[in-house]
């Protein structure tokens, strides 16, 4: 099975969710730049929170602000971007159509599937669904390697 790369803010909601998955995971740091060129060495699924929300007319892809800056910097590295295979996003259902919208943005810009969205730190059902879904996803990836991904 592939790896998980994730970002969690100081709220730690995404971190708690990833811990409950009990799968190999690498955290994008909150502060500072990633210095290690081998920070990621294998294909991964990105798990991230959604920032912003509350736009009166729903999601505004041109407004930006949904994807944490640390994740943008991470994905702007061509090597890191070349290894992403899917995205899972956290969000808050109070934001309606913007719930988990960071996943929509990353999926569109990186040309990878949006696999799942969960609220805040997820439920037990979310953990079970993601674990099973990732197992199936990585089996499928092994059978059918992805084509070259687009640049951001």
Curated annotation (Swiss-Prot):
Q: Name one GO biological process term.
A: protein modification process
Q: Which InterPro entries match?
A: Flavoprotein-like_sf, RNR_Ib_NrdI_bac, RNR_NrdI
Q: What domain of life does the UniProt record list for this protein's source?
A: Bacteria
An MF annotation (GO) of this entry: FMN binding
Which Cys residues form disulphide pairs? Answer: none
- Name the HAMAP family for this protein: NrdI
Q: Which family does it belong to?
A: Belongs to the NrdI family.
In UniProt terms, what function does this protein have?
Answer: Probably involved in ribonucleotide reductase function.
Query: What's the protein called, per UniProt?
Result: Protein NrdI
Tell me what organism the protein belongs to.
Mycobacterium sp. (strain KMS)
């Amino acid at each position: 099975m592939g790896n998980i790369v994730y970002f969690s803010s100081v709220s730690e909601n995404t971190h708690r969710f990833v811990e409950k998955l009990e799968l190999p995971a690498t955290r994008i740091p909150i502060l500072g730049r990633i210095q290690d060129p081998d920070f990621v060495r294998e294909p991964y699924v990105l798990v991230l929170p959604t920032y912003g929300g509350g736009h009166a007319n729903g999601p505004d892809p041109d407004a930006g602000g949904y994807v944490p800056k640390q994740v943008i910097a991470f994905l702007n590295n061509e090597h890191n971007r070349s290894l992403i295979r899917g995205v899972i996003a956290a969000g808050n259902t109070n934001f309606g159509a913007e719930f988990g919208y960071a996943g929509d943005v990353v999926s569109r810009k990186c040309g990878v599937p949006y696999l799942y969205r969960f609220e805040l730190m997820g439920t037990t059902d979310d953990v079970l669904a993601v674990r099973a879904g990732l197992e199936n996803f990585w089996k499928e990836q092994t059978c059918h390697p992805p084509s070259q991904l687009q640049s951001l």
